[in-house]
């Protein structure tokens, strides 16, 4: 069996200093995200979403970011899924973007709010037809008997709605409103650069602190 203790990589592609970054973390994120896209990284819009259930037990999964602006980070999902139920019980979450080819991470923490129905409708209408039908066919996170059961539901909803399926009432968007955003740049000898943006409320200026790696 491979010895996991021997797997290691020394990071040396870049550095990160307070004088190098934008004072606004959303603009800084946009800069890094564009660099990830320009570097042609595979699916740079993927992120890990961590939630916590009422008993304090965490869960995590990969989801896709679908919007970022001064209000926060937006993603869409089934409100009745495990993550949806956990966010209803505890409306706080953490996101992690990991761009290993650039030796970078971005960690975002904050409270969760639902997007407006208009935002959810607009994004849902932009999805491929198969994905829109799939939102009806899948009772996300629920146990099913077989793959064929899922495919039967897909056919049934396809016949029912044709090429104009409406947005399911149990499907829509969330916005994570950040309270903290950390930018991480890998450095040699595990002495990485970590810059943390925080603010006391949504109307305050962002403060930047350097964290020990």
From Swiss-Prot:
Gene Ontology molecular function, alphabetical: FMN binding; pyridoxamine phosphate oxidase activity
Signal peptide: none
Cofactor: FMN
One GO term of the biological process aspect: pyridoxine biosynthetic process
Pathway: Cofactor metabolism; pyridoxal 5'-phosphate salvage; pyridoxal 5'-phosphate from pyridoxamine 5'-phosphate: step 1/1; Cofactor metabolism; pyridoxal 5'-phosphate salvage; pyridoxal 5'-phosphate from pyridoxine 5'-phosphate: step 1/1
Binding site for FMN: 61-66, 76-77, 82-83, 105, 140-141, 184, 194
This enzyme's EC code(s): 1.4.3.5
Organism domain of life: Bacteria
Record keywords: Flavoprotein, FMN, Oxidoreductase, Pyridoxine biosynthesis
HAMAP family: PdxH
Record's subunit section: Homodimer.
Protein function: Catalyzes the oxidation of either pyridoxine 5'-phosphate (PNP) or pyridoxamine 5'-phosphate (PMP) into pyridoxal 5'-phosphate (PLP).
Entry protein name: Pyridoxine/pyridoxamine 5'-phosphate oxidase
Organism (species): Paraburkholderia xenovorans (strain LB400)
Gene: pdxH
């Amino acid at each position: 069996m491979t010895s996991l203790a021997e797997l290691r990589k020394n990071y040396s592609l870049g550095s990160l200093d307070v004088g190098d970054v934008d004072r606004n973390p959303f603009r800084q994120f946009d800069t890094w995200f564009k660099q990830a896209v320009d570097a042609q990284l595979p699916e740079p819009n993927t992120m890990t979403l961590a939630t916590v259930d009422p008993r304090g037990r965490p869960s995590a999964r990969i989801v896709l970011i679908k919007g970022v602006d001064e209000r926060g980070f937006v993603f869409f999902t089934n409100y009745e899924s495990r993550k949806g139920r956990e966010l209803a019980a505890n409306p706080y979450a953490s996101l992690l973007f990991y761009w290993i080819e650039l030796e970078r991470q971005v960690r975002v923490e904050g409270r969760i709010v639902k997007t407006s129905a208009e935002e959810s409708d607009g994004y849902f209408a932009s999805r491929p037809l198969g994905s829109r039908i799939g939102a009806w066919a899948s009772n996300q996170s629920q146990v099913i008997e077989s793959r064929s059961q899922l495919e039967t539901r897909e056919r049934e909803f396809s016949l029912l709605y044709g090429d104009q399926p409406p947005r399911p009432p149990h499907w829509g968007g969330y916005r994570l409103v950040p309270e903290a955003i950390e930018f991480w740049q890998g450095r040699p000898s595990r002495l990485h650069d970590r810059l943390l943006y925080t603010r006391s409320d949504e109307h305050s200026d962002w403060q930047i602190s350097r964290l020990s790696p």
